[in-house]
Every structure is written in structure tokens, then in C-alpha cells.
Amino acid sequence: MAMIKKNRKVNPLSLLVVCVVPLNCCSTIIAKCDYLKLVLQWPKSFCLINSRKCQRNPLPSNFTIHGLWPDNYTRQAPQSCTTNNFQRFTDTDIEQRMEESWPDLKQQSIAGLSYNFWQDQWRKHGSCCFPPHESEIYFLKALELKDRLDVLTILENNNFNPGTPQPFSVLRVFNTISRAIGKTPILKCAQSYLKEVVICVDNNGASVVHCPRSRPRPRPRRDPCPFSDVKFP
């Protein structure tokens, strides 16, 4: 017959160690990420739609980065995977590129004011698919994708020029970008303005992939661009 062991006193400190270690380890979680979405916003549209929030002057004359966001095909997109801050850029060239290509349009054109915006993007999105020590790699990847894909040049080469008074066919804009990048993007519109262009890439950011549910469908309420025609201010 098995003997029943007497209860031994447990040192409270040993329990404390067991509890603290997981909390420290889990301050950053790398989530499953099937692909990344490069979200490019048109500054003039942003400011027309959000006139009270827009503080940038002068406005950039090219698409700027809203974010590089992880997503999944069959499950909810991961968000807010860390509470840790990213390290400030030590390379002034990188910071200058960030100010030009990834500015906070809600802030004035003063160096350093976009850091909170970048911090939010890192905590909410970048930290879910890049390790904590690779925050700079995350930002550099977004900059590289924006320069390589160059949506404004694609549109201008096909006579979609910003500032043109007449609206453009949403389907034509969609097809033009699709042909140029070889995959389907997502167009986002508001108040009949072209607000954002989303291009999807694999989870390494190496190759462009099709964005799910991307083809425009005029007038459905939940479509990201529910218009037949759109203005490109």
C-alpha cells in the first residue's frame, strides 16, 4: 500500500519566481502572421477627410506610409503584441527617411514629433511579426517596399494625376495598380476620395501577394471603396 507523504511547507519566494518569469517572458509575443499589408495613404485625402486632425504643413506630395500590418487568411489579425518601446534611431539618415516617407500627418513638420506615431505602429503591428530587437528592420522593410512599389509613379504613368478635377473609375485605378505589381491590391476610399492603397506581401516582405477580398464592389456598405468613381485630389 502506497504511503501518503506528509505536506511540506512551501517557500513563498519559490512561488514568486514561478509567477514572475512567465510575465517577463511574455511581454512580447511573436504571433502567427500569414502576410503583411503595406498601407499607403494619400496625404491630401487624409487632410480633406480629417481636416481638424491634419496639422502637417506643407503636405507631402507623395503617398506616405500609414503602416506595415501583419494579417492572416483564416484568423484575426494579431495586434498589440508588446508593451516595449523600440529604440530611437541612431542613424540620422534613417530618421530623415522616416520623416519623409512615414510622417505623422496629425503633427507639424518638426523633427521628432512623429516618434509617438511610429511607437504606436511598432507596438500595435510591427511587434507581432518582428522580434523585439528587430524594430529597425521592421521600419526599414516598410521604407524599402514603399520605394520599390512606388504607387504614385504607377498612377501618373497611366494618366491618374493627383489634382485632376474629374473623378477616376475605381475599377480602372484598381486594374492599373494590379497590372503594375502583378497582384491585387486593396483600395480604401472615404467621402469619394482615394484615401489609401494597400499592397500585400509575404510574411518576409520579399514578394507581393494577392490581397484577400480586394476587388472593388461599388456601393456595398462594407466594401473599403464603395464608389464607382473616386477623386484623387
UniProtKB/Swiss-Prot annotation:
It is found in: Secreted, Extracellular space. GO terms for cellular component: extracellular region. Keywords: Disulfide bond, Endonuclease, Glycoprotein, Hydrolase, Lyase, Nuclease, Secreted, Signal. It catalyses: a ribonucleotidyl-ribonucleotide-RNA + H2O = a 3'-end 3'-phospho-ribonucleotide-RNA + a 5'-end dephospho-ribonucleoside-RNA + H(+). Disulfide bonds join C47-C54, C81-C128, C189-C225, C200-C211. GO terms for molecular function: ribonuclease T2 activity; RNA binding. Residues 1-31 form the signal peptide. This is Ribonuclease S-4. Residues 211-233 are annotated as: Disordered. InterPro entries: Ribonuclease_T2_eukaryotic, RNase_T2-like, RNase_T2-like_sf, RNase_T2_His_AS_1, RNase_T2_His_AS_2. The gene is S4. Its EC number is 4.6.1.19. It comes from Antirrhinum hispanicum. The keyword Lyase applies. GO terms for biological process: RNA catabolic process. It comes from the Eukaryota. Self-incompatibility (SI) is the inherited ability of a flowering plant to prevent self-fertilization by discriminating between self and non-self pollen during pollination. In many species, self-incompatibility is controlled by the single, multiallelic locus S. The active site is at H66 (proton donor), Q121, H125 (proton acceptor). Glycans are attached at N62, N72. Belongs to the RNase T2 family. RNA binds at Q41, H66, D104, L105, F117, K124, H125. The keyword Transferase does not apply.
